[in-house]
From Swiss-Prot:
It is found in: Nucleus. Residues 1-23, 206-225, 240-264 are annotated as: Disordered. Residues 213-225 have a biased composition (Low complexity). One of its GO terms (molecular function) is DNA-binding transcription factor activity, RNA polymerase II-specific. Keywords: DNA-binding, Nucleus, Repeat, Transcription, Transcription regulation. It comes from the Eukaryota. Residues 518-570 form the Myb-like domain. GO terms for cellular component: nucleus. CDD domains: SANT (cd00167). Residues 437-461, 489-513 bind DNA. The lineage of its organism: Eukaryota, Amoebozoa, Evosea, Eumycetozoa, Dictyostelia. This is Myb-like protein N. It holds the Pfam family Myb_DNA-bind_6.
Length: 577
């Protein structure tokens, strides 16, 4: 008999006879174990044990295949039975699928352990570790019950990988190895049929981390021979230690841009002779970038701004959104998320720009021209030194040939459209229409797909799409359509007809951000002056779009005022006179 028992039976007397129990209705010997998640507090068994969507271990044979999700598999294999005295006295058990074994489901951190059961109620359980022995279970009336044998064919669940196996990175900064629910991680200490399904990373401060205490009864290191097996019910990936990075970022004062640029250890071209006249391959650098950005990306994926960030990056790669607008949007997202312990995506991008550029003065000027402030350019000197060392160590560890180059510079976006390709696309659309995109993509070549051709035509080259600033009528129509359709930008763009969904989304958020900034007396003065100058020419109406551009050139606010906003503000001021 294989019994999953608990070392602490103090709460066994609190179990009511009316509790429910799960038992198997499938007699197939497919060796599937389900490790349920049970609250660690001492409660009665009145609440049904719930199996989470992703937290389970499946141990099965190679000749059988299971495509169900954990929740579907659990519901298909288990059905509810009333807890009766005829089955088990005093203890809640679950019958394991396909075997005459019972699983103790006590509500305890060490609930998933293999240990000999104590004598319970009127039943005296004779237990033996030897799987070849047949044991009889007798009750007080000396009634002989069917014998239950410890099955030699069922392998014990493998011990969970330690945090050093999950996070085997030698970097000192905080890194995360992403293992989604579809990837499988095999344990080297068990048979090849053992499979872990690992959830997304959690903070080490949560009670679900791997840093749980070991069982005091655990004596054997081999998971196949150990009787006591401690397995936490919700196994998750945790982040590696980042004490050195966090301590350096909090203990040192960020220097000024001049101090940052004057340090020889900051520039990637001067930090080591490894970078003086050589460069790593794109694949190696990309791998290091992913490792560096992974903590920030993992936090953004779980935030409510995930879709907005993905759309912004996509627009920038397709050259539909300038870098200045991208940085402005990222700054606004940073304000909405708050100043937490993790760095924002904007800070990470600024650091990467400084690392990749060999002429930092040029990069500083470039960032300032695109709206980056001095306070955002200053970063921690010790942290940047750690980043450079990690990049260098990570690239040195690759057994690949280092390519020589005079300078690296920033990478161009993938599949960037040239003028010749854009002209050819216009010609092919006039010849074939705007439906046969696969055919057009084959004729253009250059690795372009049909979707890329369609997006480039609809968002960039289509003559019906207007470019540049919005006038007051377009913006007023935009707000009405957003009130009608919500943030379904495709529906909004289909009714506007002269703007793409990307333009509609960008203009809407830009207008909302501008309206949150109060008008200053200086702005009101400039607005009144420009309107008076425009009215002197009575042959034409007031051009609010041109007036908003003049307001933007005055640089009284960081966010330019829109044409509709200028019009509303002017009539509001004159109504008060």
């Amino acid at each position: 008999m294989m019994t999953i028992n608990n070392n602490n039976l103090n709460n066994s007397n609190n179990i009511n006879n009316n509790n429910n129990i799960y038992t198997s209705n499938n007699n197939n010997n497919n060796n599937n174990y389900l490790i349920q998640t049970v609250p660690t507090m001492s409660e009665t068994f009145d609440h049904m044990i719930e199996t989470p969507q992703n937290d389970y271990i499946s141990i099965h044979n190679h000749n059988q295949h299971n495509n169900h999700s954990p929740h579907q598999f659990y519901n298909n294999q288990y059905q509810h039975y009333q807890y009766t005295n005829d089955l088990i006295k005093l203890q809640p058990f679950c019958e394991i699928n396909g075997q005459n074994d019972f699983q103790n489901s006590y509500q305890d951190p060490y609930q998933h352990q293999l240990s000999p059961p104590d004598m319970v109620g009127p039943y005296v359980n004779s237990y033996s570790n030897n799987s070849n022995n047949t044991n009889l279970i007798q009750n007080n009336n000396n009634q002989q019950l069917p014998s239950i044998i410890t099955s030699p064919t069922i392998p014990l669940p493998p011990s969970p990988p330690s945090p050093t196996i999950i996070n085997n990175s030698n970097n000192t900064i905080s890194t995360i190895q992403f293992v989604n629910n579809k990837k499988r991680q095999h344990s080297d200490t068990t048979s090849s049929s053992s499979i872990y399904f690992i959830q997304q990373p959690h903070s080490t401060s949560t009670p679900f981390s791997l840093q749980c205490p070991n069982s005091p009864n655990s004596t054997s290191s081999s998971p196949l021979n150990s009787i006591n097996y401690s397995y936490h019910p919700t196994f998750r990936v945790v982040t590696s230690s980042s004490s050195s990075a966090s301590s350096s970022s909090t203990s040192s004062q960020p220097p000024s841009p001049q101090t940052l640029l004057s340090s020889s250890s900051i520039s990637i071209s001067n930090s080591s002779s490894f970078y003086n006249n050589t460069e790593a391959s794109d694949e190696e650098m990309e791998e290091q970038f992913k490792e560096y950005l992974s903590p920030t990306i993992s936090n953004l994926i779980e935030s409510s701004h995930r879709e907005n960030i993905l759309n912004l990056v996509n627009d920038y790669l397709y050259e539909e959104l300038p870098l200045k607008s991208l940085l402005m949007e990222l700054r606004e997202i940073q304000y909405q998320l708050g100043n937490g312990q993790n760095q924002s995506l904007l800070n990470n991008l600024i650091e990467l720009f400084l690392i990749l550029d060999n002429s930092s003065n040029v990069m500083i000027n470039f960032l300032k021209e695109n709206g980056v402030e001095d306070s955002e350019i200053t970063i921690d000197q010790k942290r940047l030194s750690i980043i450079l060392n990690d990049f260098e160590n990570g690239l040195r560890g690759k057994d690949k040939t280092i390519k020589k180059s005079t300078s690296r510079g920033l990478r161009n976006p993938p599949n960037k459209w040239t003028k010749e390709e854009s002209s050819k696309l216009i010609t092919l659309v006039h010849e074939n229409g705007d439906k046969q995109w696969k055919k057009i993509a084959l004729q253009i070549g250059g690795g372009k797909t049909g979707a890329q051709c369609a997006q480039h035509w609809k968002r960039v080259l289509c003559p019906a799409i207007r470019k540049g600033s919005w006038d007051e009528e377009e913006e007023a129509k935009l707000f009405l359509l957003v009130e009608k359709h919500g943030q379904s930008w495709k529906n909004v763009a289909s009714e506007i007809r002269t703007r793409t969904d990307i333009q509609c989304r960008y203009q809407y958020f830009k207008s909302c951000m501008s309206r949150e900034v109060p008008w200053t007396p200086k702005e009101d003065e400039i607005l009144q002056k420009k309107v008076i100058e425009n009215k002197q020419d009575s042959t034409k109406e007031i051009g609010w779009m041109d007036l908003s551009k003049a307001m933007a050139r005055a640089r009284q606010t960081k966010i330019p005022r829109t044409a509709l906003e200028c019009k509303i503000r002017f009539y509001f001021l004159n109504a008060q006179l």
